[in-house]
Amino acid sequence: MELSEGELSHTSSSSSFVPVDQRQLQDAIQIIDENKHFNTGILDYINKTSPADVGNNYHIISVFGSQSTGKSTLLNRLFNTNFDVMDESNRQQTTKGIWLAYSPVVSTTLGHTTSKSNILVMDVEGTDGRERGEDQDFERKAALFALSTSEVLIINIWETQVGLYQGANMGLLKTVFEVNLSLFGKSKLETHNDHKVLLLIVIRDHVGVTPVESLAKTFTSDLQNMWSSLAKPAELEHLQFADFFDVTFHALNHKVLQPKEFGEGINRLGDRLVVSNELFKPEYHHDVPIDGWTMYAERCWEQIETNKDLDLPTQQILVAQFKCDEIVESVFQEFLAKYQHHFKEVDAAPDFEELGALFADLRQDAFEDYDASASRYNKAVYEQKRKKLRWLINDKLKEVFDVHAKNLCNTLLEKFEKDLVALKGKDFAVNVKTLSTKLVEDVNFQVSLMSLQGDLSLDEIILALTKDIDAIVAKQQVIELNSIVNKSVKKLSASLSKSIQFELGDPNEETWDNVLQQFKGVYEKFGGDFGLGTSSTQNQQAIEKFKFKSWCQFYDVTHKLISREKLLALLQDRFDDKFRYDENGLPKLYLNEQDLEKTFAVAKQHALQVLPILTFAKLTDGSEIVPDYDIFDSKLREQFLGGYDDSDDEEDHCFAEIITEQEKSEVLAKFKKEVDAKYIETKRSIVQHITQIPYYIYLIILVLGWNEFMAIIRNPLFFSLSIVLGATVYVLYYLGLLRPALVVAQRTMDEVIVMAKTKLREVLIDDHEVTGRQLNKMAGSKENIELDDM
């Protein structure tokens, strides 16, 4: 809705004419006379008065309003036409029938402005004239003709008429709008055209106390309410006022008391027409050349005048409408009282069959009351208002209907959702179809019991239910799809972990080729439609997510199994395998330093040869392992993992680098420290073994202890023990265990010596130290006694 307000005034009824070149003026032509005869010479008049071929370049403007309100004066001042105007000394009807005139120029703030388009103006006989009295037939038909053939309909109204019903011609407009809807409504539905008519409300004699915006709001509200109350055909009930009309406003001051302001308001209205061109829109035009419009106007008048389907309401029908409306209102109020009594509370678990029967009884009671009072009036009106009552009752019952239907749907949807979760992805798509079909059938059956045999539509309920089902299924599909992805990633992670652990047993140049081959074996098998009924896009997204997570798992598992600590332990184990044990897996005994140094170098080399293999994932062809996705990209991690650590963005990552150079140096330093300690320990044991007792000492012992040896030989007990000891030594020598046995014996002896020294130190300790300890013990005992006494 548009507004335009001048600084304006109080009733303009006298003729006022802006001087214009009289040679440009053309006499108006009466296209419909007061006896309802149509003038077929319109086209000749237009061709004669127009300066050039009109074609489609024209606009039709008409004026509508009460008699003697200055309609003709407004047109003459604005469009520089020469319609007859009322003699101010004698208020009586001036315009009879409908007149048409060509506008040579339009009055604007720039002066007389020539329009780019040809403007044809129709002056329509005023309404509510004393000459016609109660005969409103012509004024209704004339108003309908103007509305049907014009692009812009000027409704000329005094400020004091705004808010009135009869004074503002609302009753007449209602009748005209009803017939207009019947005439053009079906055409609009069939052709889907966007044709409209602009209602230009010119508020005359505007004092300025009430703002134009307020007047416009009141008048627009009256139009909307009037449209809502129209008796529309069933197929046209959904059409709105805005589908047929646009509304804009313009206010004019009093022509006599404020002539200057009145003229300025006229000029501003002219600006809106031809300067800014805001009032002429393509959808207002009938989109036919001028000769087609004249033919259309003639056919339109014939249909309005003669077609019985468009007969305007008679007084009898008007009375019937009024009385039937009263009866409908009374019956509906009685229905509402019963409605409130029965449906004060909503039953959580109703019997739908009983509820449907109650609906039918309430409605039938209302129909019987209506029929008893309204059936004596005009049958068409009676039936029409009965339909209105039916619609009112159905609309009210629909409230309870919707509540129970919604509760039923919610209950069944909860069960449906639990059933979906219980499927755990097994035959998901098939079971979803079965469950959803059963759910819709259950709702359809239960709700139809209270639908008044289909009068209360199930379409919205079923549509909403279907959307809810789709939403629940879509949600569960995502859950199941994520579950499949996560389970597959776990399976891949377990397989990858086993593969890496196996390769760590004996790493070599083909280690990462084997790991990658095992990874790709599981990685590339993932795919398909998953049997969830998901779209190809969702399936592809799931595959992408699986692959991204798989590479993340590759990275995480390798770093978990090959950490600094585990790498150090692995190097030590490989070193010990060569340094402490021989090829047969038996403990190795070193008898000289040369053998120790040689074995130490071999063991150390054996351990360190896997360090470059395990710290950087490189294939046999020299290339590093590169993932299909940049798993360190924050956007990808957000997309596939749902979040990421901002601190990771500050670090430079290399997928193939398992141990950094700094960590590698730390591991190498710790490894060297550990193996060097083992080397020194082993070397010390060799030195101890070599420096024990010289061999010649054994010869001296043999010479000096000959008698003792002989005594042992001659003694059966000692001789037997010697035989057993000798046999044991021989067996150990034969089995190759003599050296290990000697080492064990030597270490046992060393431990015995250490323990003996400790005991001897305790025995030989100074007496004063012993005495001191005893005194300390006594003092402690005394304190304990005192504390106990306390």
Curated annotation (Swiss-Prot):
Record GO biological process: endoplasmic reticulum membrane fusion
Entry's localization field: Endoplasmic reticulum membrane
A GO CC term attached to the entry: endoplasmic reticulum membrane
Membrane spanning residue stretches: 693-713, 717-737
Binding-site list for GTP: 65-72
InterPro entries, sorted: G_GB1_RHD3_dom, P-loop_NTPase, RHD3/Sey1, Sey1/RHD3-like_3HB
CDD domains registered for this protein in UniProt: GBP
Membrane-related topology note: Multi-pass membrane protein
A Pfam cross-reference name: RHD3_GTPase
Lumenal-side positions: 714-716
Residues annotated as domain GB1/RHD3-type G: 55-284
Keywords: Endoplasmic reticulum, GTP-binding, Hydrolase, Membrane, Nucleotide-binding, Transmembrane, Transmembrane helix
Residues in compartment: Cytoplasmic: 1-692, 738-790
Gene Ontology molecular function: any one: GTPase activity
EC number: 3.6.5.-
Similarity comment: Belongs to the TRAFAC class dynamin-like GTPase superfamily. GB1/RHD3 GTPase family. RHD3 subfamily.
Summary of the function given for this chain in its UniProt record: Cooperates with the reticulon proteins and tubule-shaping DP1 family proteins to generate and maintain the structure of the tubular endoplasmic reticulum network. Has GTPase activity, which is required for its function in ER organization.
Name of the featured protein: Protein SEY1
Organism in which the protein naturally occurs: Candida albicans (strain WO-1)
Gene that this sequence comes from: SEY1
